[in-house]
Amino acid sequence: MSDLSSVLEIAAPLAGVGGLGYAKARAPRVYWSLVGMPVTWCRFTFTYRATMDVCGLTVRPSALRAFLVRNVARREVLPVPPKVRRVRGTSTGLRVTLRLPAGLEPADVAAASERLRHAWGVHSVNVVETKPGVVELRMTGYDVLSRVRMPRRRRRGPADSLVVPVALRDDGTAFVRDYRKIPHSLTLGSNQSGKSMYQRNLIAGLAKLPVGLIGIDCKRGVEQGRFASRLSALATTPDEASELLGVLVSEMEDRFNLLADHQVSDVWELPEKLRPVPLVVLVDEVAELFLASAKKEEERRDRTVTQMIRLAQMARAVGIYLEVCGQRFGSDLGKGATSLRAQLTGRVVHRVNDKQTADMGLGDIAPEAVSSVTTIPPDRPGVAVAGDSSGGWSRIRTPELTPAEAVAVCREYAHLTPRIAALAPFRPAVRPEPMPADSAPLARPVPVTD
């Protein structure tokens, strides 16, 4: 019995250490909840004031406070760090709410985020301004982008909201496409960068919403043709794309007439019974629309680019949104490229082959994010840098979604596909759903005898 007790005394700690090591490698959320979060919380609590002081995030106390500390409390007057309002643990890290003293701004804390990360031993520290004078430190305990798991709890918006969770940010929150706030977006990425995965997640999310999806895929529809059950229109050649964009411009003008008749400036101000269905135009390989090798094709290109710019400038008010994707995008594409880019507020740039494409994608809104794009490794497909016109940016990664899964979602919600008369000529043919190989036939053959 004593031998068994000795074995258990030795084996139990070894098994515990081995289990923690396995959890750290295979189940980082479990390891963080059991070990990482308590250790980091204690380290933050006991080293907060000293860390803020050495990182330059303290200010001199006011004259009144210095007088009270020196003469009433009989203590040494120390610099004042930001006041900790709240500390909250999550499955991916810590959330710390700080009240900034007079003399500090959120940019000061953001500039010291790398030093704070090393001081507290976390994977990353992101600074978000929640309201004037208050910031939130979003600490991530491990690399959440190595294995993407979307947050389970999502904020539910109103019934008419157009919010689609697409990817996971490096701070553990969901990256969403909110078409009411950011109506148009530009997504860039080279081959095998994860751009197609991003598109599949976006289409699968939009398929569940009461919107119309318009596809423009000049690769003969090899990317978007499989989603025909949920598409209201599909163009597979540059000529068809030009015709389809012309129809969309006419639809935009008709909707503006509807707004003028009811004296409103936005489609969402109309009564629900009169409100036309929102349309999301998904453009794949936008560079194909700019290419021309003959005089006739140049006329088609100029017409197509002009129509896209018109939609990007005015279509938001009537509920038509652009989602433009491509492998590369530069001013050398021709006239109208920079004008179109200026109207696309949202930017998502995956790994690209040239720095010019990264500059065109993010250089005008977040120049410091360009260097982050060029460091995306090729062995991590789906990683991208997302930014907008506010200057903020973050790294994101799209969860894996196979084409078959995206097609299944489109077939499930095919009943939401709106029937628009003007788009009827471009309605793609829907192939019947293939029958599983192991399914039994409905009718059994009967042999014919004499």
Give names to the regions the model predicted.
Residues 131-139, 263-276, 327-329:
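Glycine/charge-rich, flexible interdomain linkers and switch-proximal surface loops
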Residues 35-162, 172-173, 331:
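N-terminal "pre-motor" subdomain/linker immediately upstream of P-loop NTPase catalytic cores
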Residues 264-279, 428-438:
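Amphipathic alpha-helical surface "interface" segments used
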Residues 1-36, 40, 154-262, 276-359, ...:
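P-loop NTPase catalytic phosphate-binding loop
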Residues 30-68, 404-406, 425-447:
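Acidic, low-complexity cytosolic linker/stalk segments
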